[in-house]
Amino acid sequence: MRYYILLLTASLLAACSSTPDFNAPVDPDEVIATYVDIARASYGDSLITARELEASINRFLAQPSAAGLEQAKQAWLAARIPYQQTEAYRFGNSVVDEWEGRVNSWPLDEGLIDYTADSYGTQSDFNYFYSANVIANEILDAGGVVVDAAVISPQLLAEELHQLDGVEANVATGYHAIEFLLWGQDLHGTSPGNGERPWTDYSLDNCTNGNCDRRRQYLASATTLLVNDLEEMVQNWQEGGAAYTNLMAKGTQGGLATMLTGMGSLAYGELAGERIRLGLLLNDPEEEHDCFSDNTHNSHYYDAVGIRNVYMGEYRRVSGELVNGPSLSQLVIQEAPAVSAEMMARLEETEFAMTAMVAEASRGNTFDVLIGRDNTEGEAIVTRIVDALMEETRTIEKIINELALTNVNIEGSDSLDNPEVIF
């Protein structure tokens, strides 16, 4: 994954060579149009890479092998890069937020899906289906709820299993369900190492851990659903689509408010809080975002890049094409030059802090290692990211004030606002 980081860094430098004229007047409606263009491009890339993931998984299932499983894993990792850059569109856009749970829900109680180690346990006070293991069982019966799972299909996953019994941790679809099926559980705790699922879990001739036929069906179904869901979101951003229509209905001020809501909520409540600070407080690897693959460092990095994309009005496609146009950054420099300079400094500090985390991961010190108890160096690296994101959010709030925007609600997190309730 270091290749992708280096590619993106190079693209950011290249983008600087085509920096727009910041002295030219900027039409706020054109800024919103650029925001839409980037949504179309980044969700389009998410769909392209999901289709490549599907093709890789289909090849693996046709001829299971260790090499085939590794290729599928690499395709999954590549698919995460454009998708994570879309997450700044989640908050403030209700169409995206309501849809997002189908593709990126976490954390998940993986025992709903497949076999787990003894250390996982068999019961949860909050989830009757904590260890239901649908791959091994054609009928699920718990807490008065019965599910006929004789046929594993996209419909079963989407309509019956996902968030079964109203429990959010019953994640049956999306990137993280596929991640678990490719890697298996990460049993290394806060030590180096990720999931070690054998390729033979998908072999019909040399099946390990039983039910390989149903496991194959589940993996294929989950991947089909991911592609279908991303196709839906791509259409949502076309003219006349639900996300596009909702955004346009908000008007100019509402559109700008949506952009800043997405940036601030991702930076503060979601990324700094729920995805980073919470895991650090609990020293719990179960709180890391891509916990089976240990790809969390990259997911966090590209979330931060997504925030920058929205502000700078530019996005580098997987093809290498640069999508850009009139930007929020240009608008801010016109209205409040000092705040604009401050925001650029905040973005640079966040990128620097994130890059340090990625560098540690390349040495085997992935996010779950960094948040381990008594890892003072790891804590310092992660805390610097949290601090940078919090400062970034404070500057976003200044931008909101300078642009005289209203109805901007930046989401918080107990891990930042009320940490005492975590314990």
Which positions does each model-derived feature cover?
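Sec-dependent signal peptide recognition
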Residues: 2-7
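C-terminal motif of bacterial Sec signal peptides marking the signal peptidase cleavage site
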Residues: 12-15
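Bacterial signal peptide processing site
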Residues: 17-20
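Mature extracytoplasmic or organellar-lumen-exposed domains after removal of signal/transit peptides
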Residues: 22-423
